[in-house]
Amino acid sequence: MIVKVFDYIYISNVYNANDIYELIKLNIGGVLTCFDCTCIEWCHHNDTNVTNKIFYKDIFVNTKKDLIKCDVPIITNKSVNSDIIGGTHQINNYYNEQNNNYHDNTYKEFTQTHKTNIDPSQIKSDHINEERKEHYDYIIFPSDIINNTQCNNNNLKDYIKSMLILKEDAYIDFDVIHMDQLKNKHNNNNNNNNNNNNNNNNNNNNNNCCTFKNPDISNTSQHHVEHIQIHKSNSHSNIPSDNINFCNKKYDKNLSRSVEISEKDKHPENSLLYEFVNKDKLNYKINQEEDTVSSEKNKLCDNNNNNNMVHTRHIYNVCELNKCLRENKLIPYNNIYKMKHLYLNILDTFDENILKHVNKAHLFIDSVIQKKKNILIHCMAGISRCSSIILSYVSKKNKKGIEYNFNLLKSKYPFAHPNENFYRQLLLYEKMNYTLDGCTDYHNIYKKIKMNRENLEELKILNLKNDKQPIYNFRCKHCNYVLFNDNEIIKHDFKISKIKKNYGNSCTSIFIEKKEWILTENKMKGVLNCPNVNCNIKLGKWSWTGICCSCGYLQIPAFMINSSNVDRMNISKTV
């Protein structure tokens, strides 16, 4: 389940994060994985700054051109483009020229760039930092996934299944042309067409009528004739290159429809036949123009004097994509989805310092949102780590506090539940005014935590939640081990979960916050046992998907203890 929780921000678990075509449908341009894993199926894991692997349907296939993998080059003996190191704005336009000897010898050099050797001492590798850099993954997709409203989540999987099956050793190639040459070509064509249109308009004004070669529509009304003339005077040189492939759908449809309306008054019985005739004529004309554009584009690709690229055309639906793959044609770069990805190695434990990851995570989230793309933040179960990162980011932006945003997050995604350690650190982050550098008492506490994670225990003493002093402790009835206090009991919130019918009126269970002694790693539900090794008796159960109380209230997530297994003791008497 992928859920939108805030503007531009989605949350899920690792299983849903693998639904790459659903992510494309949701316009997600970046994925933040809050644990170190290699189970993202569409992510190609390697240590190079380029890749020749691209994800298609459910496998990786090879590409005949290298694609940028990372913004910063990895330490190698090879030379890299010095222009790439400075920023990310040229990433789309850079293609590695090395390792290009393929079996078919069809690979051609795309860029001629100035190269310089990088001093390895100036670059910190992944092994030194023990952190993964953000990288890019590439996915082949038909544009219909984004543009077609009928392609929803219900039939998206069937739509993907209809894509052509390829072997893992298959090679595909994609298509690029030079932006400057294309721009000049289009400008010249636009100027010529504008002059032609002006001459035509002058002739039409002098003649006070509109004349066409086709005699069947020469006597139509002025309004309909003008509408027809607009479509007929257009050409591919006036249409942006990204829309060339849509001409057959929009261009001839409008013209045929206009002709049909015009002819209904004269020959209503022949309007359909007339439409087919004009469609054939127009399709023939468009096919000729497409052949011309394609030949010009191929010439431009052979004259590679600049690495500033623009990508043309679209494959609109899966049928066109399958045909293109069967005939070994070039895949338009517009049908290659570029996904930004970052791994954060966060452990869901009670001694993990999650605040050391927030600055890197926030920069990554901003870089995705600034491009008007959505971002998916997920962890293994989609509960603790990802929700903690989301709370830190949103609270820093809106300044409404961790508790307020946590309640808002749970109202949209009930599974969100940072562990007790993470939540205390988030409250400390709020006390530090969402900064990690400072000279306040709270900043000094965080500096101690950075030096030694054992100092996280000090956060328990600070009472960052501003809770009242607890009155009761709850102990195991069999061994008298202290389990929790009354401040850690979760009361029923009937505004969030409705009470189910046909249940009793009394509660026989107690729901508590997640405690350190509750082990939930890599599981969705389990049994709550006494943490005392000599006892280990069953106290209750837990589930990330929720448990229903005896009164009918549904608690999500739930850590439920049977009231008959614990004793309530006054704290003043136990001291």
Swiss-Prot record:
CDD domains: DSP. The active site is at 379 (phosphocysteine intermediate). Zn(2+) binds at residues 476, 530. Residues 185-213 are annotated as: Disordered. Residues 283-435 form the Tyrosine-protein phosphatase domain. GO terms for molecular function: protein serine/threonine phosphatase activity; protein tyrosine phosphatase activity; protein tyrosine/serine/threonine phosphatase activity; structural constituent of nuclear pore; zinc ion binding. It is found in: Cytoplasm; Nucleus. Changing residue 530 to S: Severe loss of catalytic activity. This is Dual specificity protein phosphatase YVH1. The lineage of its organism: Eukaryota, Sar, Alveolata, Apicomplexa, Aconoidasida. The keyword Hydrolase applies. One of its GO terms (biological process) is regulation of cell development. SUPFAM superfamilies: (Phosphotyrosine protein) phosphatases II (SSF52799). Its main location: cytoplasm. The keyword Zinc applies. Interacts with PES. Keywords: Cytoplasm, Hydrolase, Metal-binding, Nucleus, Protein phosphatase, Zinc. Its EC number is 3.1.3.16, 3.1.3.48. It comes from the Eukaryota.
